[in-house]
Amino acid sequence: MLLSCSIFRLFCIILLLQLGSIYTKDFTALCSTCRQLVDDFDKGLEKTAKQNFGGGNTAWEERKLSKYETSEIRLTEILEGLCQSSNFECSHMLEENEEHLEAWWFKRKTKHPDLFKWFCIETIKVCCPKGSFGPDCNTCIGGADRPCHGNGKCDGDGTRAGNGKCSCDEGYDGEFCLDCSDGYFNSLRNDTFFLCKECHESCVGCSGGTNQHCKECRNGWVKDQEGSCIDINECIKDPAPCSDDQYCLNTDGSFSCKACDIRCTGCKGDGASSCLNCADGYKDEEGTCTDIDECTEDPASCSDNQHCLNTDGSFSCEEKVPAFNSEGAKTGDSPEKHEDL
């Protein structure tokens, strides 16, 4: 019996948590829908503000336009253009609250020109003023003007949802977003602002923005005699960090190994001009490894009954095959096949 009661209580708690989640999501969506509805209403106002009767009588048009400006006809035109047919949430909100919009149009507009504030916040109460949250529109941490002290986002800000907790921007931490995250330091603090800036890339923790303000150095950096974190040049270490067919490229805090050019046997950098020695099939010409044209060498690289074809770093020999004309007379030789050497 006790076990059954415990299970029932647990079920109730889970159900309440789920309902709370749905409630929050509903109010966030409702506020968004209301905001969109008001935005569309404002667009309708702009669109209908320039109605042209085209009668040619300016005085007559001014009288008609003056009447049209606050008329039921104009309101109807605006309402008909509010919600797209596929937007069920907007259509449902409009259907339930059309009388409120009519009341604002005919009785409240002059005294309450801000439709969003009057309709979404004060009348149907699905939104809150900026800088407040929740069912009672409580003020966010840090105040309505600068929620989370301007360094984060207040949960539920501007809606009847949320718990008001701060989600701090990058570089900021703490319940009130008044602390700097790891890797950042406080560069400005007064009654109005609290500013965090990123540490120098060489630092693990810092008190300022240069490599002289590091508490510790990151891997790949080391402190010099003056206490500044400087890059370690891994490329000058012995033994070398890269293989014989690679060259070392030092970077800030690290290094990388790059493949040598195909014309090189060992290298100290990129390209054929950085070779330590030239690979087979290449020769050094004024400090750059270039292709050897084996087909021009003496003695010849191919036999007398072969054609020589030079390639980059190598060559091939093609067998000569007798060629004949249409009358059967021999006209010369043509290549038959390739033999890579």
From Swiss-Prot:
InterPro entries this protein is in?
DUF3456, EGF-like_Ca-bd_dom, EGF-like_dom, EGF_Ca-bd_CS, Furin_repeat, Growth_fac_rcpt_cys_sf, LE_dom, NOTCH1_EGF-like
Assign the protein's first listed, main location to one coarse class.
secreted
| Ion transport recorded as keyword | no
Q: What does the record list as coiled-coil region(s)?
A: none
The record's annotation in PROSITE patterns points to: EGF_1, EGF_2, EGF_3, EGF_CA
Q: Where in the cell is it found?
A: Secreted; Endoplasmic reticulum
Alphabetically ordered keywords of this record: Calcium, Disulfide bond, EGF-like domain, Endoplasmic reticulum, Glycoprotein, Repeat, Secreted, Signal
Q: Which domain of life is it from?
A: Eukaryota
Where does each FU repeat begin and end?
193-248, 254-308
GO MF assignments: calcium ion binding
Signal peptide positions on this chain: 1-24
Q: Name one GO cellular component term.
A: endoplasmic reticulum
Q: Tell me where in this chain the EGF-like domain is found.
A: 136-178, 291-317
State the family named in the UniProt similarity comment for this chain.
Belongs to the CRELD family.
Q: What does this protein do?
A: Possible role in neuronal acetylcholine receptor transport.
Which PANTHER family would you find in this protein's record? Answer: EGF-LIKE DOMAIN-CONTAINING PROTEIN, FIBRILLIN-RELATED
Give the protein's recorded name: Cysteine-rich with EGF-like domain protein 2
Whose protein is this, by species?
Answer: Danio rerio (Zebrafish)
